[in-house]
């Protein structure tokens, strides 16, 4: 059969069905979403939880959510911009920061559910494979599935760093070691030391040292924030170790305090008057009008 040209007449447009809005905008992969959202029919009203990881230029977002007809419900969330509270003040979008954000999400969620003492995860971070074991005579481990959105799932991606942090924090996320840094596809072998180096930011420290020796100007430009805050290559591992301990000690969310002496915002339009102010304004207008009438009568 040869090529048949589509005739875009009245009948064509009457029957035309547009794709979903988020598909048209290129924001949602509905092929993947369907498989992440649809629950087994024998589990009835049990939600299917997703570990959502999204990366931006300045932040790493980790959320646990489940789907309903009216929309997704967020159970818990953690962001890399919270890490300065735990001692990590720079490099909030690298692999180590993604791991820390995933760890923060896991500990925060389990604390809310009252499972933080039963499922502590692993405190010995070796970079090797770890899976949460369910406890006997108790509630099972919290199970969720990784949702990477439109991100490419290549080996060494930061989304898998966030997932590893969540798993080490005590969540049950089905995964394999094939996408972690240190896995060689040709030899099919996994080097856990390479993965551990990424978790503690040692790859950043190594690059800092090499760049400082090769090109000092580039080093000062690329690592200006590190230099400003006095973060050296030798101190990076200790910073992340302390951050992991601090996250486990207190993963709860802290509300941002408003600054007392903050700058007063400019207002470009008039503020609406209250009822009392409107009544007072009318009263003044009446008094002024009566006074003017009296002055005219006397004249």
From Swiss-Prot:
Protein location: Cytoplasm; Nucleus
InterPro entries: Rbsml_uL18_euk, Ribosomal_uL18_C_euk
Single GO MF descriptor: 5S rRNA binding
Gene Ontology cellular-component terms listed: cytosolic large ribosomal subunit; nucleus
UniProt-listed GO biological process terms: ribosomal large subunit assembly; translation
Keywords: Cytoplasm, Nucleus, Ribonucleoprotein, Ribosomal protein, RNA-binding, rRNA-binding
Source organism, top-level taxon: Eukaryota
Family: Belongs to the universal ribosomal protein uL18 family.
Record protein name field: Large ribosomal subunit protein uL18
Organism: Bombyx mori (Silk moth)
